[in-house]
Amino acid sequence: MSEPNAIVKVGNIIFSNEAPFSLIAGPCQIESRDHAFEMAGRIKTITDQVGIGFVYKSSYDKANRTSLSAVRGVGLENAMAIFSDLKKEFGCPILTDVHTEEQCTVVASTVDILQIPAFLCRQTDLLVAAAKTGRVINIKKGQFLAPWDMKNVLRKVTQSGNRNVMLCERGTSFGYNRLISDMRSLPILRSFGAPVIFDATHSVQEPGGQGDSSGGQRQFVEILARAAVSVGVAGIFLETHQDPDNAPSDGPNMIKIDHLQRLLETLMEFDYLSKKTIE
Protein backbone atom coordinates (compact mmCIF):
# COMPACT_ATOMS: atom_id res chain seq x y z
CA MET A 1 0.00 0.00 0.00
CA SER A 2 0.99 3.65 -0.29
CA GLU A 3 2.50 4.53 3.05
CA PRO A 4 1.06 7.53 4.91
CA ASN A 5 3.24 10.53 5.50
CA ALA A 6 4.84 10.42 8.94
CA ILE A 7 4.86 14.22 8.98
CA VAL A 8 1.70 16.06 7.96
CA LYS A 9 1.95 19.80 7.36
CA VAL A 10 -1.07 22.08 7.44
CA GLY A 11 0.11 25.57 6.57
CA ASN A 12 2.92 26.17 9.05
CA ILE A 13 1.55 23.61 11.54
CA ILE A 14 3.31 20.24 11.81
CA PHE A 15 1.76 17.00 13.03
CA SER A 16 4.34 14.32 13.78
CA ASN A 17 4.47 11.65 16.45
CA GLU A 18 8.08 12.63 17.16
CA ALA A 19 7.61 16.42 17.20
CA PRO A 20 6.01 18.62 19.88
CA PHE A 21 2.26 18.14 19.75
CA SER A 22 -0.03 20.60 17.99
CA LEU A 23 -3.51 21.53 19.16
CA ILE A 24 -6.85 21.09 17.42
CA ALA A 25 -9.40 23.05 19.43
CA GLY A 26 -12.64 24.98 19.34
CA PRO A 27 -16.29 24.72 20.37
CA CYS A 28 -18.32 21.66 19.44
CA GLN A 29 -20.40 23.52 16.86
CA ILE A 30 -20.54 26.93 15.23
CA GLU A 31 -23.10 28.78 17.33
CA SER A 32 -22.82 32.12 15.52
CA ARG A 33 -20.29 34.17 13.61
CA ASP A 34 -19.54 36.33 16.65
CA HIS A 35 -19.06 33.30 18.90
CA ALA A 36 -16.72 31.63 16.40
CA PHE A 37 -14.59 34.77 16.21
CA GLU A 38 -14.51 35.10 20.00
CA MET A 39 -13.42 31.50 20.51
CA ALA A 40 -10.86 31.43 17.70
CA GLY A 41 -9.35 34.70 18.89
CA ARG A 42 -9.05 33.57 22.49
CA ILE A 43 -7.54 30.20 21.59
CA LYS A 44 -5.11 31.80 19.13
CA THR A 45 -3.93 34.23 21.81
CA ILE A 46 -3.34 31.38 24.26
CA THR A 47 -1.51 29.14 21.78
CA ASP A 48 0.68 32.04 20.66
CA GLN A 49 1.59 32.72 24.28
CA VAL A 50 2.56 29.14 25.06
CA GLY A 51 4.15 28.51 21.65
CA ILE A 52 2.08 25.69 20.23
CA GLY A 53 0.62 25.06 16.78
CA PHE A 54 -3.13 25.63 16.55
CA VAL A 55 -5.85 24.38 14.21
CA TYR A 56 -9.37 25.72 14.83
CA LYS A 57 -12.19 23.16 14.80
CA SER A 58 -15.95 23.46 14.85
CA SER A 59 -18.87 21.65 13.23
CA TYR A 60 -21.45 23.16 10.88
CA ASP A 61 -23.90 20.26 11.33
CA LYS A 62 -24.08 17.87 14.27
CA ALA A 63 -25.71 15.17 12.19
CA ASN A 64 -25.87 12.47 14.88
CA ARG A 65 -27.52 14.34 17.77
CA THR A 66 -29.39 12.14 20.27
CA SER A 67 -32.70 13.98 19.82
CA LEU A 68 -34.45 15.23 16.67
CA SER A 69 -35.11 18.54 18.43
CA ALA A 70 -31.44 19.14 19.33
CA VAL A 71 -29.59 22.11 17.83
CA ARG A 72 -27.47 20.95 14.88
CA GLY A 73 -25.56 24.04 13.73
CA VAL A 74 -25.51 26.89 11.22
CA GLY A 75 -25.36 24.74 8.08
CA LEU A 76 -22.78 24.22 5.35
CA GLU A 77 -23.10 27.47 3.39
CA ASN A 78 -23.01 29.76 6.41
CA ALA A 79 -20.12 27.81 7.92
CA MET A 80 -17.91 28.11 4.85
CA ALA A 81 -18.25 31.90 4.90
CA ILE A 82 -17.40 31.99 8.61
CA PHE A 83 -14.43 29.65 8.19
CA SER A 84 -13.07 31.72 5.32
CA ASP A 85 -13.22 34.89 7.38
CA LEU A 86 -11.66 33.17 10.41
CA LYS A 87 -8.68 32.12 8.31
CA LYS A 88 -8.22 35.66 7.03
CA GLU A 89 -8.49 37.17 10.51
CA PHE A 90 -6.38 34.74 12.55
CA GLY A 91 -4.28 32.87 9.99
CA CYS A 92 -5.06 29.50 11.54
CA PRO A 93 -5.94 26.34 9.59
CA ILE A 94 -9.49 25.00 9.95
CA LEU A 95 -10.83 21.48 10.61
CA THR A 96 -14.43 20.38 10.27
CA ASP A 97 -16.42 17.19 9.74
CA VAL A 98 -17.88 15.84 6.52
CA HIS A 99 -20.80 13.41 6.50
CA THR A 100 -21.50 12.73 2.82
CA GLU A 101 -19.44 12.40 -0.34
CA GLU A 102 -21.13 15.49 -1.79
CA GLN A 103 -19.93 17.68 1.08
CA CYS A 104 -16.25 16.86 0.58
CA THR A 105 -15.54 19.08 -2.44
CA VAL A 106 -17.49 22.01 -1.00
CA VAL A 107 -15.77 21.82 2.37
CA ALA A 108 -12.33 21.30 0.82
CA SER A 109 -12.64 24.59 -1.06
CA THR A 110 -12.26 26.43 2.26
CA VAL A 111 -11.25 24.02 5.02
CA ASP A 112 -7.73 22.62 5.50
CA ILE A 113 -8.49 19.35 7.30
CA LEU A 114 -11.50 17.16 6.54
CA GLN A 115 -12.53 15.06 9.51
CA ILE A 116 -14.27 11.71 9.16
CA PRO A 117 -16.60 11.19 12.15
CA ALA A 118 -16.12 8.07 14.25
CA PHE A 119 -19.53 6.63 13.33
CA LEU A 120 -18.64 6.95 9.62
CA CYS A 121 -15.02 5.79 9.67
CA ARG A 122 -15.72 2.59 7.70
CA GLN A 123 -17.79 4.30 4.98
CA THR A 124 -15.67 3.61 1.91
CA ASP A 125 -17.32 6.10 -0.45
CA LEU A 126 -16.93 8.91 2.08
CA LEU A 127 -13.28 8.06 2.73
CA VAL A 128 -12.48 7.93 -0.99
CA ALA A 129 -14.29 11.20 -1.71
CA ALA A 130 -12.46 12.94 1.13
CA ALA A 131 -9.13 11.51 0.00
CA LYS A 132 -9.60 12.74 -3.56
CA THR A 133 -9.92 16.37 -2.43
CA GLY A 134 -6.20 16.32 -1.63
CA ARG A 135 -6.81 17.89 1.76
CA VAL A 136 -5.42 16.49 5.00
CA ILE A 137 -7.78 13.86 6.41
CA ASN A 138 -8.31 13.23 10.13
CA ILE A 139 -10.10 9.93 10.71
CA LYS A 140 -11.69 9.33 14.08
CA LYS A 141 -11.52 5.72 15.22
CA GLY A 142 -14.98 4.30 15.71
CA GLN A 143 -15.95 3.57 19.29
CA PHE A 144 -16.79 0.07 18.04
CA LEU A 145 -13.38 -0.68 16.46
CA ALA A 146 -10.18 -2.20 17.76
CA PRO A 147 -7.15 0.00 17.06
CA TRP A 148 -5.69 -2.52 14.60
CA ASP A 149 -8.89 -2.32 12.54
CA MET A 150 -7.89 1.23 11.61
CA LYS A 151 -5.14 -0.08 9.36
CA ASN A 152 -7.74 -1.03 6.76
CA VAL A 153 -9.45 2.34 7.17
CA LEU A 154 -6.12 4.09 6.62
CA ARG A 155 -5.49 2.03 3.48
CA LYS A 156 -8.74 3.21 1.91
CA VAL A 157 -7.41 6.77 1.97
CA THR A 158 -3.79 6.13 1.02
CA GLN A 159 -4.77 3.77 -1.80
CA SER A 160 -7.02 6.55 -3.10
CA GLY A 161 -3.93 8.70 -3.58
CA ASN A 162 -3.82 10.75 -0.38
CA ARG A 163 -0.94 10.14 2.03
CA ASN A 164 -1.74 13.08 4.32
CA VAL A 165 -3.82 11.19 6.85
CA MET A 166 -4.06 11.36 10.63
CA LEU A 167 -5.71 8.83 12.94
CA CYS A 168 -7.65 10.03 15.96
CA GLU A 169 -8.41 8.03 19.12
CA ARG A 170 -11.63 9.11 20.83
CA GLY A 171 -12.48 6.28 23.21
CA THR A 172 -13.99 2.81 23.03
CA SER A 173 -17.48 1.67 24.01
CA PHE A 174 -17.53 -0.01 27.41
CA GLY A 175 -21.07 -1.06 28.26
CA TYR A 176 -24.02 1.28 27.96
CA ASN A 177 -23.44 5.06 27.75
CA ARG A 178 -19.76 4.72 28.61
CA LEU A 179 -16.42 5.09 26.85
CA ILE A 180 -12.97 4.16 28.07
CA SER A 181 -9.53 5.10 26.76
CA ASP A 182 -7.07 2.26 26.26
CA MET A 183 -3.70 3.97 25.95
CA ARG A 184 -2.29 0.88 24.21
CA SER A 185 -4.30 2.06 21.22
CA LEU A 186 -1.95 5.01 20.67
CA PRO A 187 1.27 3.08 19.93
CA ILE A 188 -0.75 0.59 17.86
CA LEU A 189 -2.15 3.40 15.72
CA ARG A 190 1.29 5.01 15.60
CA SER A 191 2.77 1.78 14.19
CA PHE A 192 0.80 2.31 10.96
CA GLY A 193 3.01 5.31 10.17
CA ALA A 194 0.48 8.15 10.35
CA PRO A 195 0.38 10.98 12.91
CA VAL A 196 -1.89 10.10 15.84
CA ILE A 197 -4.29 12.53 17.50
CA PHE A 198 -5.90 12.03 20.91
CA ASP A 199 -9.38 13.48 21.37
CA ALA A 200 -9.38 14.22 25.09
CA THR A 201 -12.90 15.63 25.34
CA HIS A 202 -14.99 13.14 23.34
CA SER A 203 -13.15 10.37 25.18
CA VAL A 204 -14.99 11.39 28.37
CA GLN A 205 -18.37 11.61 26.65
CA GLU A 206 -21.32 9.55 27.90
CA PRO A 207 -23.21 8.90 24.64
CA GLY A 208 -26.93 9.35 25.21
CA GLY A 209 -26.18 9.42 28.93
CA GLN A 210 -28.72 12.13 29.75
CA GLY A 211 -31.65 10.48 28.01
CA ASP A 212 -32.26 13.00 25.24
CA SER A 213 -28.66 14.20 25.08
CA SER A 214 -25.13 13.00 25.78
CA GLY A 215 -23.43 13.47 29.10
CA GLY A 216 -19.77 13.65 29.96
CA GLN A 217 -17.14 13.71 32.70
CA ARG A 218 -14.95 16.71 31.97
CA GLN A 219 -13.07 16.24 35.25
CA PHE A 220 -11.16 13.42 33.52
CA VAL A 221 -10.10 15.39 30.42
CA GLU A 222 -6.77 16.55 31.85
CA ILE A 223 -5.94 13.11 33.26
CA LEU A 224 -6.47 11.39 29.92
CA ALA A 225 -4.68 14.13 27.99
CA ARG A 226 -1.67 13.81 30.29
CA ALA A 227 -1.64 10.06 29.72
CA ALA A 228 -1.85 10.46 25.95
CA VAL A 229 1.01 12.94 25.63
CA SER A 230 3.07 10.76 27.97
CA VAL A 231 2.63 7.87 25.54
CA GLY A 232 3.46 10.18 22.62
CA VAL A 233 1.06 11.70 20.09
CA ALA A 234 1.22 14.20 17.24
CA GLY A 235 -1.74 16.24 18.39
CA ILE A 236 -4.33 16.83 21.06
CA PHE A 237 -7.95 17.49 20.11
CA LEU A 238 -9.96 19.49 22.65
CA GLU A 239 -13.38 21.05 22.55
CA THR A 240 -13.59 24.21 24.62
CA HIS A 241 -16.19 26.87 25.40
CA GLN A 242 -16.54 29.94 27.58
CA ASP A 243 -19.65 28.43 29.25
CA PRO A 244 -19.77 24.68 28.62
CA ASP A 245 -22.75 24.06 30.90
CA ASN A 246 -24.90 26.19 28.61
CA ALA A 247 -23.43 25.11 25.27
CA PRO A 248 -25.91 23.70 22.72
CA SER A 249 -24.00 20.42 22.33
CA ASP A 250 -21.35 18.36 24.14
CA GLY A 251 -21.22 20.79 27.06
CA PRO A 252 -20.58 18.14 29.73
CA ASN A 253 -17.29 17.08 28.13
CA MET A 254 -15.99 20.46 26.91
CA ILE A 255 -13.46 22.30 29.06
CA LYS A 256 -13.79 25.93 30.07
CA ILE A 257 -11.59 28.13 27.95
CA ASP A 258 -10.41 29.86 31.14
CA HIS A 259 -8.61 26.61 32.01
CA LEU A 260 -7.04 26.04 28.60
CA GLN A 261 -3.69 27.80 29.04
CA ARG A 262 -2.79 26.04 32.27
CA LEU A 263 -3.78 22.69 30.75
CA LEU A 264 -1.63 23.25 27.66
CA GLU A 265 1.37 24.30 29.73
CA THR A 266 1.05 21.11 31.77
CA LEU A 267 0.68 18.93 28.68
CA MET A 268 3.72 20.53 27.06
CA GLU A 269 5.86 19.44 30.00
CA PHE A 270 4.67 15.84 29.73
CA ASP A 271 5.10 15.96 25.95
CA TYR A 272 8.69 17.15 26.26
CA LEU A 273 9.60 14.26 28.54
CA SER A 274 7.86 11.76 26.28
CA LYS A 275 9.51 12.94 23.07
CA LYS A 276 12.89 13.20 24.80
CA THR A 277 12.54 9.51 25.70
CA ILE A 278 11.56 8.60 22.12
CA GLU A 279 14.69 10.29 20.80
From Swiss-Prot:
NCBIfam families: KDO8P_synth (TIGR01362), PRK05198.1 (NF003543). The keyword NAD does not apply. GO terms for cellular component: cytoplasm. It holds the Pfam family DAHP_synth_1. Its main location: cytoplasm. GO terms for biological process: keto-3-deoxy-D-manno-octulosonic acid biosynthetic process. InterPro entries: Aldolase_TIM, DAHP1/KDSA, KDO8P_synthase. PANTHER family: PHOSPHO-2-DEHYDRO-3-DEOXYHEPTONATE ALDOLASE (PTHR21057). Keywords: Cytoplasm, Lipopolysaccharide biosynthesis, Transferase. It is found in: Cytoplasm. Belongs to the KdsA family. The lineage of its organism: Bacteria, Pseudomonadati, Pseudomonadota, Alphaproteobacteria, Hyphomicrobiales. Pathway: Carbohydrate biosynthesis; 3-deoxy-D-manno-octulosonate biosynthesis; 3-deoxy-D-manno-octulosonate from D-ribulose 5-phosphate: step 2/3; Bacterial outer membrane biogenesis; lipopolysaccharide biosynthesis. The gene is kdsA. Its EC number is 2.5.1.55. This is 2-dehydro-3-deoxyphosphooctonate aldolase.
